[in-house]
C-alpha cells in the first residue's frame, strides 16, 4: 500500500504541510511504509494508494485520485468553513476526513455532517535540555504564523509587561513583523494607545532555524490566546509541545487541546505566571521536565503517524502491503 500526501499549493514552510505532510510521511517511511509527498507526477497513483489531501487541496484533485482508483483522506486543521469554499465539497468527496483536534472534528461534523478521525500535530523540534535560570532581564518569546496575531491580545500584553514586569525582553517571530511594529508605533505616536515600550520588543522575521535558535535562548514562551474567536479552540497544541521539547516553560491560555498539558505549563493569568515562575524556578523547571517526558511519549511523529495510518487503514478497509 502506497501512502501519498498532496496539496495543490504545497509549501514546506507552511506549518500544516510540514507537520501533517513532510514530518508524518518521513515518520511512516522510517517505519517501513511506502510514504512520501506526492508532487505533480501522478503516474504511481492507483488502486493500491491512499492519498491524504492536506490544506489548500481542491475537490478536482480528490476526484482525480478517486478516478485513478485510490482511497482518499481529506485533512483539515483550520476552522475556516465560512471562508474556504472548498472545505465542504472536499469533505463530502473524500472517503475519509481527518482533523487536528477533537474540537475541529466537532466543527467539521456541524458544517458537513461528516465524522472524522483525529491526528494531533506531532512535535518537530529536537529535544533540548530543560532550563530555567533567568537573569535580571527575563527573556520572553512568542512565535506563530502571521494569522496568529489575530488571536493574540498584543497591545494588552505589551502594556502589562511594561507596567507589571519591567525587566523583560519580548522577542516575537513571525512573517511581516515590521508591519505590525510600524503600525503600533504610529498608533502610539497619535495617542491611540499608550504604555508600550518598543525598546523592549524585538520583532524578527520567521525562519525555522531562527525559531529554533530563539527557543534555545529564551526563558519563557509567552503565548496567551484570545478565546472569543471560534477558530482558537479548534487549534492543535503544536506550538506548546515544540516549546516544551525545546526545554522551555510555557505560559498560555486554557484551550481544549492544551488542557492535558495544564500540569506542565501555566494556563491562567500570564503576568501571574511570569511572577510565579520567577519566584519558584525549581517548580517551573520540574514542570518543563515532566512536560517533555509526557510530550515525548504521546506526541512524537512516530507514535502519531502509526496511530493515524492504522486508523485510516481500518476505516477504509484496506490492507497494508
Which sequence ranges carry the predicted segments?
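Conserved catalytic-core segment of nucleotide-activated headgroup transferases in glycan assembly
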Residues: 7, 11-27, 125-128, 133-217, ...
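Extended catalytic core of nucleotide-activated donor transferases of GT-like folds
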Residues: 36-108
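Donor nucleotide-sugar binding/catalytic pocket of nucleotide-sugar-dependent glycosyltransferases
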Residues: 95-129
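A charged, aromatic-enriched C-terminal amphipathic alpha-helix characteristic of glycosyltransferases
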Residues: 126, 279-313
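Nucleotide-sugar-dependent
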Residues: 149-150, 202-214, 221-242, 252-262
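A short alpha->beta transition loop at the rim of the catalytic pocket in nucleotide-sugar-dependent
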Residues: 219, 247-248
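C-terminal "capping" alpha-helix adjacent to the active site of nucleotide-linked donor transferases
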Residues: 266-286
